[in-house]
Amino acid sequence: MVYIMGFEGSANKLGIGIVKDDGTILSNIRHTFITPPGEGFLPKDTAKHHRSFILSLVEKSLEESKLKPSDIDCLAYTKGPGMGPPLRSVAVTVRMLSQLWDRPIVAVNHCIAHIEMGRLITGAVDPTILYVSGGNTQVISYSLKKYRIFGETIDIAVGNCLDRFARVIQIPNDPSPGYNIEQLAKKGKNLIELPYITKGMDVSFSGILSSIEGMVKNKQNKTQHSVEDLCYSLQEHLFSMLVETAERALAHCGQNEVLAVGGVGCNQRLQEMIQQMISQRNGKSFAIDERYCIDNGAMIAWAGYLIFKNGTTTPLSQTTTTQRFRTDQVDVTWRD
C-alpha cells in the first residue's frame, strides 16, 4: 500500500492532498488567495500566502487522512508551469519535509496532473482533452507516450480572459471571478456580437477581451448593454471557439470522448455545449466538479504516484521549478 502527498501552488490556490495507490483520495485540502474586486493576484503576494498556510494545510491533510508522516511514501510537487514565486515557495517546503521525513520527491507537470485526475475520476479511457484554466488553454490527445497538443491559445488563456474581464466590471474574486461571471451570464438574454477567432485548432482571446472591455468603458456614453448580457455574450463566444476546436481535434484523432479539465472546465455552460457537440457524434463527454477541476493537491499526488510506481523519483538537487513546462515535454511512461 502506497500513500502519496501532493503539493499544488502554481497560482493563487494552495492545495495539499493525499492519495492511495488504488486512486482513493484520502484528503484534498485547499486554501485560496483572494484579492479585492478589480484586482488580480501578484506573484510575491501569492507566494507569501502559500508560505503562511502550507504547513497548517499539511497538518490538516494528515489529520483528515488519519495518517502520520511515517506513513507517507513519497512527496509530489508541482514543478510547473505556473507563477515563479508561488511555485518556489511550495518547492522549498517540499524539500524541507523530504529531508525531515526522509521521503523521496517526485516533480509533476501541472497540466499532466489535471489530465490524469480527470481520467481517474471519470473513467475516461482515451479522450480528447480540453484543458481550460487561468493559465492554459490547450486541446490535447495522447499518442506515442506523449500528451500531444493539437491546438492552443496563441495569446492569453481563456481563464485569464474571464479573470481580466471580471476586474473591468469590478465583480468579486470570491469564490472565483469565472464562477461569478458564470452566474451573471445565466441572467443574460441578449447575445452581443463579439470577435470570434479560430485558426485551425488554435484560438485567440485577446481581441474579444479588448472589444468587450471597450464596451464596458463606453457605458458612460449610455451603451445599452447590461453586465449580464456582456457576461453571457463573452461566455457564448469563448466557449463556442473552444468547442469548435475540440471537435476538429476529435475528427483528426478519430476519437469519440471529450474530457474537460482545468478550472474553467467546471463551468456548467461549457459542459453543456461540449455535450451538445459530442452527442451529435454519438460520443461521450466527461467533466469533473470543482473539487478536482480547480487546482488541488490530490491531482498532484495522483500524477506523482503514476510516476513513482515506475521507480522514478527526482533527486533533491533537481527539485527545481519552471514557469514554462509544456504538456508535451513529459514522457508518459505509465500509459501503453
Curated annotation (Swiss-Prot):
CC terms in the record's Gene Ontology section: cytoplasm; EKC/KEOPS complex; nucleus
Annotated keywords: Acyltransferase, Cytoplasm, Metal-binding, Nucleus, Transferase, tRNA processing
Enzyme Commission number(s) of this protein: 2.3.1.234
Enzyme class: transferase
Entry's cofactor comment: Binds 1 divalent metal cation per subunit.
GO biological process: tRNA threonylcarbamoyladenosine modification
Molecular function (Gene Ontology), one example: metal ion binding
Catalytic activity, as annotated: L-threonylcarbamoyladenylate + adenosine(37) in tRNA = N(6)-L-threonylcarbamoyladenosine(37) in tRNA + AMP + H(+)
Short name of one Pfam family: TsaD
Residues the entry annotates as binding substrate: Y131, V132, S133, G134, G135, D163, G178, E182, N267
Subcellular location: Cytoplasm; Nucleus
UniProt subunit comment: Component of the EKC/KEOPS complex; the whole complex dimerizes.
Function: Component of the EKC/KEOPS complex that is required for the formation of a threonylcarbamoyl group on adenosine at position 37 (t(6)A37) in tRNAs that read codons beginning with adenine. The complex is probably involved in the transfer of the threonylcarbamoyl moiety of threonylcarbamoyl-AMP (TC-AMP) to the N6 group of A37. Osgep likely plays a direct catalytic role in this reaction, but requires other protein(s) of the complex to fulfill this activity.
UniProt protein name: Probable tRNA N6-adenosine threonylcarbamoyltransferase
Gene for this chain: osgep
